[in-house]
Amino acid sequence: MNTSHSDYPFDLGTHCPAFVVTNDEAAAWFATGLSWLYGFNHEEAIGCFRHAARADDGFALAWWGIAISSGPFMNKPWEWLTMPEKEQALAACHGAIAEAMSRTANAPPEARALIEALAVRYPQTEVPDDGVLASWERAYADAMIPVYEAYGDDPDIAALYIDSQIMLTPWQIYDVDKRAPNPEAREREIQAALERSLAGTGADHIGVLHFDIHVQEMSPTPEKALPSARRLQELAPPDAGHLQHMPSHIHALVGDFDEATRCSRLSMATDKRFMANLHRTPFYRTLVCHDVHMLMFAGMQTGNLADAADAAIVMAEILENVLVHRPVTHMDMTLEGYYATIAHVDVRFGRWQQIADREFAGDPAFMPVSHAMHHQARAVALAALGRHDEADMAAADFDAARARVPAGYAYFNNQADDILAVGAAMMRGEMAYHAGETEAGFDWLREAVAAEDRLVYTEPRAWMHPPRHALGALLLEQGRIDEARVIYERDLGHEEELPVSRQNRGNVWSLSGLAECYEKLGDPRAGDAGAALAAALPLADQPVTSSCFCRGRAGGSGTA
């Protein structure tokens, strides 16, 4: 079907690479497709590139766009795909790049170089083992080096080169715990390309800005990407929801949850306009959920129940009638993981009775992690209410549900069982504490902290309620003020003890706990801590007098 670009309902801006040579209609479709590509909506990008190919049968880059959009990217690497998904992707990629290669005779040199480089990434339609697929990624990254050397001043060439190098170690450019580059990553080359491009025209390029945020967020210095985050807030196209969301990654890491919330609200409003199209872009649903997840996280970190609860409601709406079969693909598991985060909201805000009264809505076979999270939350709530026998039964239900989660089940970038290990230790810690087994409770909560610290980086967090907040609150309740002080200082990043991505800078809960510790210790830093807390409290819509609602007399409502 031939559709005029003027009738397309979404505004993705008008940026078109300087090396695109075609008619106006094809160029408009190509520009829109490329913006969707930079915004990780590959499925919609494919449709736009197909329109470009129909508008100009000799337009080689349109077929390049189809090929690159049909293949792996940061949020969908080869190793996350099932065999049928790999077969479908490779057939599409190989076929499209062959079409592009057949049209390069009159293509500009930059376009021809991009097409020839991408061709080495998809040399056949038969799916090999993962080792060979990885070698194809290396071959493509290597092929992009001379392209970048020749044309790297062009921001689109720079963005595509940076992406090719990132894809050698997606989400693993840095070793978070060692606070150093992963030896397998081309970190030096990536950073050099980013610095060069950001010093030039890349400073106004949505792809370069997007990739800069992703690279720096995993580094020891995420604040380095603040200029890119702020510029992307200004430049993200009106209908590119994920690009509007992306600055929130950096804002959250540096503790600016007001800006993270603002980005999240904007992206969610944009995503709402696109929702009717999710039937044709099923993978993009994961990105829409991700944007909502960030608002949930920001609300939980600021003590704003309205924001967190709104996000939970929207998350449930997005996933309505979606989680209706056994999860098979990584996408299935990711969507189910997003649904599972909803259970964390009521725990964070101590809504114990609501949790205790709630029955699980859904089929446990289709929602195994959500089912386990439901029982974990009930055990914590019942223990806080002093209903210890019922808490024991809920804990047994959690153990049974956890055991039924299939081996290898993914939960974002982590294994589901590693996430549930945090919940198990946190649950048993609070249960033991409220049952009067104080030391056992602290031991379990320290194990929860250690389990959370072992998780693979993901932003926002897969486990939404930091165990340090519970541990610090209950240590304070027992008068162990100096121990609590250390917990809060580490959580807020006041010490070098924790990598940045394991800190919770600027969160109102630890600010409250640390201010209380300093005041009780007579610490001269009490004034500064109180001022920091006073600055954070206006974002909260709930009283915050402790870092966890689990603090308080067993059987009571708890305090925070």
PLM segments and residue spans:
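TPR-repeat structural position
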Residues: 42, 187, 222, 257, ...
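Single-residue signature of alpha-solenoid repeat helices
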Residues: 45, 93, 140, 190, ...
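C-terminal non-catalytic interaction modules
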Residues: 486, 490-499, 503-560
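TPR/TPR-like (Sel1-like) alpha-helical repeat modules
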Residues: 60, 67-72, 83-102, 252, ...
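Short coil/linker segments at helix-helix boundaries
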Residues: 2-58, 63-153, 160-204, 209-219, ...
